[in-house]
């Protein structure tokens, strides 16, 4: 699901809200979440999951074309850990219907 599809789905289920208001709310929420992670803070949404940063230490990699060693700097990467309710819901729905390939 893309951001546009999410906005459409919410707007169709909430006809009393203007489409533009739904779009603004989704964009602001995602922007705030990005800023929070960029500031090194954790986000926890009970029943859904938590977003945090994981540290990846510096390492030596290889250029796939030349095979030359390349120094890769340390970095932080976003990480999502699903909550118990989300895991259970996903697992129960997977047993009922096969996954659709896109």
Swiss-Prot record:
A family per Pfam: Bac_DNA_binding
SMART domains the UniProt entry points to: BHL (SM00411)
GO biological process, one term: DNA recombination
Transcription recorded as keyword: yes
Keyword Zinc (UniProt): no
Segments of this protein annotated with the region Disordered: 54-102
Any GO MF annotation of the entry: structural constituent of chromatin
PROSITE patterns the record matches: HISTONE_LIKE
GO cellular component: chromosome; cytosol
Chain intervals with Basic and acidic residues compositional bias: 82-91
Composition bias, Polar residues: 93-102
Gene3D superfamilies: IHF-like DNA-binding proteins
Protein keywords: DNA recombination, DNA-binding, Transcription, Transcription regulation, Translation regulation
HAMAP family: IHF_beta
Function per UniProt: This protein is one of the two subunits of integration host factor, a specific DNA-binding protein that functions in genetic recombination as well as in transcriptional and translational control.
Complex and partners: Heterodimer of an alpha and a beta chain.
Similarity annotation: Belongs to the bacterial histone-like protein family.
Name of protein: Integration host factor subunit beta
